[in-house]
């Protein structure tokens, strides 16, 4: 498998509970390397822009409120098959359906407060990385 990069986000429900280190450790223990990271407090505009794909979904307003409720850690991860590996480590969106030992099974509070986000494909990874990071901020 090729070395690739993916986007990862530790959401406010997790940062408020001081889980940034624990979640990052789970990612690193799985063989992913953090090549960029920053802590941000999303504005409403940033959250609406980042999640624009969901703007017509019934949960959009609640999603934006949650994402602007506290600090978020945005990261670029690198490794073999990083996109799939990150999604496997995160677990199912609904923590009730997540496999044992995944981030969401261990740390998520609910489907709405599921602690993490990760890119689902190479195209979205590139788009999401570019949304939060300039090329000079990514240090391999």
From Swiss-Prot:
Q: Which UniProt keywords apply?
A: ATP-binding, Cytoplasm, Kinase, Magnesium, Metal-binding, Nucleotide metabolism, Nucleotide-binding, Phosphoprotein, Transferase
| Essential cofactor(s) | Mg(2+)
Binding positions for ATP per the UniProt entry = 11, 59, 87, 93, 104, 114
Main localization (coarse): cytoplasm
Q: Where in the cell is it found?
A: Cytoplasm
| Active-site residue numbers | 117 (pros-phosphohistidine intermediate)
Q: Which GO terms describe its biological process?
A: CTP biosynthetic process; GTP biosynthetic process; UTP biosynthetic process
Show the PANTHER family listed in the entry. NUCLEOSIDE DIPHOSPHATE KINASE (PTHR46161), NUCLEOSIDE DIPHOSPHATE KINASE DDB_G0292928-RELATED (PTHR46161:SF3)
State the function annotated in the UniProt record. Major role in the synthesis of nucleoside triphosphates other than ATP. The ATP gamma phosphate is transferred to the NDP beta phosphate via a ping-pong mechanism, using a phosphorylated active-site intermediate.
Family, as annotated: Belongs to the NDK family.
Q: What is this protein called?
A: Nucleoside diphosphate kinase
């Amino acid at each position: 498998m090729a070395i690739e990069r993916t986007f990862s986000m530790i959401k406010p429900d997790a940062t408020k509970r001081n889980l940034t280190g624990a979640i990052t450790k789970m990612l690193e223990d799985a063989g992913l390397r953090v090549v960029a990271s920053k802590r941000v407090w999303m504005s409403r505009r940033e959250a609406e822009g980042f999640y624009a794909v969901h703007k017509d979904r019934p949960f959009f307003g609640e999603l934006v409120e949650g994402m602007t409720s506290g600090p978020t850690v945005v990261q670029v991860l690198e490794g073999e098959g990083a996109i799939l590996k990150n999604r496997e480590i995160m677990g199912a969106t609904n923590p009730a359906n997540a496999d044992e030992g995944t981030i969401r099974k261990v740390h998520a509070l609910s489907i709405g407060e599921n602690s993490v986000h990760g890119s689902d494909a190479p195209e979205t990874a590139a788009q999401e990385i570019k949304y939060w990071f300039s090329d000079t901020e990514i240090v391999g």
